[in-house]
Amino acid sequence: MADEEKLPPGWEKRMSRSSDRVYYFNHITNASQWERPSGNSSSGGKNGQGEPARVRCSHLLVKHSQSRRPSSWRQEKITRTKEEALELINGYIQKIKSGEEDFESLASQFSDCSSAKARGDLGAFSRGQMQKPFEDASFALRTGEMSGPVFTDSGIHIILRTE
């Protein structure tokens, strides 16, 4: 139990049914990894709660027909289902994790957000500027860490914390 308490915020230890190995899952970012996460979710906190006042992230957004605005710079009317959007997101995550593609090139080609023109870079932001699930995931990530699928009213995101 003491081992669990030392995990960074949002992380929990789980057992893989397929490989019978322990892995770590972050319920805020939906990230999973075999290696035990170390340290705090951030360093140099400036807001008195052990987290930075601002973070910088890039993201790849896949919208679906239930998104709050089902259109993008890439497509006037988005008709894909939420399930199809999640399938695309999971495929992108696999390509990034395998090294087949890098985050920035996928974001610039396939993101439904206009930030695609900046390779997914959203710049720095503080709490209260983004939709809550996106914000929570962004602040829970460590610099250089990528989330799993993050669901917001805009669609499904992969978030990469860059600062």
UniProtKB/Swiss-Prot annotation:
Q: Which UniProt keywords apply?
A: Acetylation, Cell cycle, Cytoplasm, Isomerase, Nucleus, Phosphoprotein, Rotamase
Q: Which residues in this protein are found as N6-acetyllysine? A: K46
Q: Which residues carry this modification: Phosphoserine?
A: S43, S71, S108
PpiC domain location: 52-163
Domain WW, by residue range, is 5-39
**Chain residue ranges for the region called Disordered:** 33-54
Q: Which GO terms describe its biological process?
A: negative regulation of amyloid-beta formation; protein peptidyl-prolyl isomerization; regulation of protein stability; response to hypoxia
Protein name listed in UniProt: Peptidyl-prolyl cis-trans isomerase NIMA-interacting 1
Q: Which organism is it from?
A: Macaca fascicularis
